[in-house]
């Protein structure tokens, strides 16, 4: 007989999948339809190329080495892959995204599939699991941490993700206090947790380095 905790976890899993599908249908598919795949707007970044590059820089600065493997959760059209290649990185890459329209636009030489992090085999590991902009819209805290927990389970070195910083002026988005996130992450086995702030105009977001 299933334990109560198992029912709760199954409920969160189902809710996360349903919310993700809803976001794809109502939001992200329209960005793909309306913008060129080489633009950052096609994956929902509406604050300019300079800010998008800054996000990639902060992700890279977590310590991604030249041959490190990367699992890109919510990869969109794999812009992160392009950025890493431009830094001299040459590791194994898998991009996953629930938006099939986005995956269909990814260059054929880039390993990307229509999937979510729950679809990844339990024993599959990458040095880094990365989520760029995944937690900004439509997912409640419990759903975001469901994804984060799965990312940790697939990481050899660590996970990297960013979030909007509370208080955030637009209530349509989901924002968090950095110390709140650090506290919640501390329950997972780790060697270090680092919060990177003060890099974005108006301190609008922060990046988390979680080292396993």
Model-derived features with residue positions:
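Short acidic, low-complexity intrinsically disordered linear motifs used
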Residues: 1-6
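Class I (Rossmann-like) S-adenosyl-L-methionine-dependent methyltransferase catalytic domain
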Residues: 7-63, 67-121, 142, 146, ...
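Conserved acidic residues
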Residues: 68, 127, 157
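A short acidic, Gly/Pro-enriched loop at the edge of an enzyme's catalytic core
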Residues: 121-129
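A short SAM/SAH-binding and catalytic strip from SAM-dependent methyltransferases
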Residues: 128-141
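A short glycine-rich, Lys/Arg-flanked "PGG" loop and its adjoining helix->strand segment in the class I
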Residues: 145-157
């Amino acid at each position: 007989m299933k334990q109560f905790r198992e029912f709760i976890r199954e409920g969160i899993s189902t809710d996360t999948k349903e919310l993700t599908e809803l976001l794809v249908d109502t939001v992200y598919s329209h960005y793909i339809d309306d913008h060129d795949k080489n633009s950052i707007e096609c994956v929902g970044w509406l604050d300019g190329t300079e800010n998008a590059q800054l996000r990639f820089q902060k992700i890279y600065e977590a310590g991604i080495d030249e041959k490190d493997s990367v699992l890109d959760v919510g990869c969109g059209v794999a812009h992160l892959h392009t950025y890493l290649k431009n830094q001299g990185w040459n590791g194994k890459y898998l991009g996953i995204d629930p938006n099939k329209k986005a995956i269909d636009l990814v260059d054929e030489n880039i390993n990307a599939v229509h999937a979510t992090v729950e679809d990844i085999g339990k024993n599959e590991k990458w040095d880094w699991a990365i989520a760029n902009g995944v937690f900004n819209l439509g997912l409640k805290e419990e759903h975001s941490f469901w994804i984060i927990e799965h990312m940790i389970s697939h990481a050899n070195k660590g996970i990297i993700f960013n979030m909007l910083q509370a208080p955030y002026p637009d209530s349509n988005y989901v924002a968090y206090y950095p110390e709140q996130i650090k506290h919640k992450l501390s329950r997972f086995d780790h060697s270090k947790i680092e919060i990177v702030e003060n890099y974005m105009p108006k301190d609008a977001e922060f990046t988390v380095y979680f080292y396993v």
